[in-house]
C-alpha cells in the first residue's frame, strides 16, 4: 500500500495506447483451468499478461452465464493501467461522455472559461446543465470559492468509563504536537490540521482532519491515522477498536459532513439579471425564489433530507465519473444547500454550497486514460502549483456545474417546462 499520491505528480504516459495483444489460446487454456479447479480466477495475472487474463475471465463468464461480452472486452487502453483500480477485470463499462459550456468561472483557483466534462446515461441532463451555463455566462459568470478543506478519519477507542474517556480527551489536547509528528511521519504531503474528540459512554472517537493537497487522500490519512493511534495506545490506557469509527463519515449520509464538512466545502453563486431570467429561462426571479424556498428548503426539511437542493447529485455524479473520482462519495458530495432570492434591483441571486466534496486530481481513478483526459479538459490534471490548487479548481468547477444544473431545473419548474423538456428530447 502506498501512503501518498504525489500532489506534484503528472502522468507522463499520455499515450495510453490500446490493449495489449491477447493470446487467445492461452486465454482459453486459463479459462479451462479455472473450470477444472486448477487455477483461481483472481490469480490469472500470475500466469498471463493482464489483457489475456481479462480475456480468460470473459470466456469463463460467457460460458457460465450465456452472456456475450464482446462490448465489455472492447476497451481502448492496456488492462495493466487499471490494475491499481480493480481486481478480476473482464473489461470496461463505457458511459457516454459529453461537455457543457464553456462556462465563465471566477474562482479562487480557477479563473477562466472552461468546458465541463460530464459522464452519464441520463438523457436531458447535459442539455439542462448547458442551459444553466449559458445563463451564467449572460450574467457575467459565476463566482466560486473553496471555503474549507480537510479530509477526515475518526478511529474509535474503548475506555473503561467516562472519566477515562475525558482523560483521553485531555491527553489529546495536551499532545497535539506529538500526534501531528506521528501522523506526518508516514507522508511527504499530508498535514494534520486538528483532532476533535467525541465521548459517547465508554467510547472515544477522535476525528483527525488533514490537508491532503491535490489527493482525495483517504489512503494517505488512513495510514497516517494508524500511526497516531499506535501512539495513543502506547501512552494512554485506551484501546483502539477500529481505525474507522463512522464519525469520519465516509460514503454514508451524515449530518457531521453537512455541518463540519469533509474534503472540500465549496460555494458557487451568480446574480442573474431579471431580463435574462425572463427572456432565457421564461420565468421570473420571484417564481424561482419561491420554488426554491418551498421545494428545496421546506420540502427537504419535511423529508428529513441532508440535501437542500434540486438535483446536485446529478452533475456531481457525472463529473465524478468523468474525472476518476470515487463514485461512492457522491453520497457526501450531494450534501448541498441551494439558495435563491430576489435582489433589491429585482434580479435573481442563486447559490449552491457543497459541504463535503471529496475529490482529487492525483491518485486513484484519475490515472486512468479517459479520466486523465477529462481532467485535461478542465486543465487540472496532476498536482497543482501551489499544491492543492488543482483539486481546489476541480471543486470550483463541480460547484459551478451544480449551480448551472440547479438554476436550469428551478427555471424549468417555474415555467412548467420540466416534463416537456424530457418529452422533446425523447427521454
Predicted regions and their residues:
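Acidic/polar, glycine-rich intrinsically disordered N-terminal extensions of enzymes
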Residues: 1-114, 148
Amino acid at each position: 500500500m502506498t501512503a501518498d499520491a504525489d500532489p506534484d505528480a503528472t502522468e507522463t504516459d499520455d499515450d495510453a495506447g490500446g490493449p495489449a495483444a491477447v493470446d487467445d489460446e492461452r486465454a482459453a487454456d486459463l479459462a479451462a483451468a479455472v473450470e477444472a479447479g486448477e487455477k483461481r480466477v483472481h490469480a490469472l495475472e500470475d500466469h498471463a499478461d493482464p489483457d489475456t487474463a481479462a480475456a480468460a475471465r470473459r470466456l469463463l463468464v460467457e460460458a457460465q452465464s450465456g452472456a456475450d461480452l464482446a462490448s465489455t472486452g472492447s476497451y481502448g487502453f492496456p488492462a495493466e493501467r487499471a490494475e491499481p483500480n480493480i481486481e478480476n477485470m473482464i473489461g470496461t463499462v463505457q458511459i457516454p461522455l459529453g461537455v457543457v459550456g464553456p462556462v465563465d468561472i471566477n474562482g479562487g483557483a480557477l479563473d477562466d472559461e472552461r468546458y465541463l466534462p460530464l459522464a452519464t446515461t441520463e438523457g436531458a441532463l447535459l442539455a439542462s446543465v448547458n442551459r444553466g451555463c449559458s445563463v451564467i455566462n449572460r450574467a457575467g459568470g459565476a463566482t466560486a470559492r473553496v471555503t474549507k478543506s480537510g479530509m477526515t478519519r475518526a478511529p474509535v477507542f474503548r475506555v473503561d468509563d467516562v472519566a477515562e474517556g475525558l482523560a483521553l480527551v485531555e491527553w489529546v489536547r495536551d499532545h497535539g504536537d506529538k500526534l501531528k509528528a506521528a501522523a506526518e511521519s508516514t507522508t511527504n504531503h499530508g498535514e494534520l490540521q486538528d483532532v476533535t474528540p467525541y465521548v459517547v459512554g465508554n467510547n472515544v472517537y477522535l476525528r483527525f482532519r488533514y490537508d491532503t493537497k491535490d489527493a482525495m487522500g483517504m489512503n494517505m490519512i488512513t495510514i497516517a491515522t494508524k500511526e497516531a493511534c499506535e501512539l495513543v495506545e502506547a501512552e494512554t490506557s485506551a484501546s483502539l477498536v477500529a481505525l474507522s469509527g463512522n464519525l469520519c463519515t465516509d460514503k454514508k449520509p451524515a449530518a457531521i459532513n453537512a455541518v463540519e464538512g469533509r474534503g472540500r466545502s465549496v460555494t458557487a453563486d451568480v446574480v442573474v439579471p431579471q431580463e435574462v431570467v425572463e427572456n432565457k429561462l421564461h420565468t421570473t426571479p420571484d417564481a424561482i425564489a419561491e420554488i426554491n424556498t418551498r421545494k428545496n428548503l421546506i420540502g427537504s426539511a419535511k423529508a428529513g433530507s441532508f440535501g437542500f437542493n434540486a438535483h446536485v447529485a446529478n452533475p456531481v455524479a457525472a463529473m465524478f465519473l468523468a474525472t476518476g473520482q470515487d463514485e461512492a462519495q457522491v453520497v457526501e458530495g450531494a450534501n448541498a444547500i441551494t439558495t435563491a432570492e430576489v435582489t433589491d434591483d429585482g434580479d435573481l441571486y442563486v447559490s449552491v454550497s457543497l459541504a463535503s466534496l471529496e475529490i482529487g486530481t492525483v491518485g486513484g481513478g484519475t490515472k486512468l486514460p479517459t479520466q486523465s483526459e477529462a481532467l485535461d479538459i478542465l486543465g487540472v490534471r496532476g498536482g497543482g502549483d501551489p499544491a492543492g490548487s488543482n483539486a481546489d479548481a476541480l471543486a470550483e468547477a463541480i460547484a459551478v456545474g451544480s449551480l448551472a444544473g440547479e438554476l436550469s431545473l428551478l427555471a424549468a419548474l417555474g415555467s412548467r417546462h420540466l416534463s416537456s423538456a424530457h418529452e422533446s428530447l425523447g427521454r
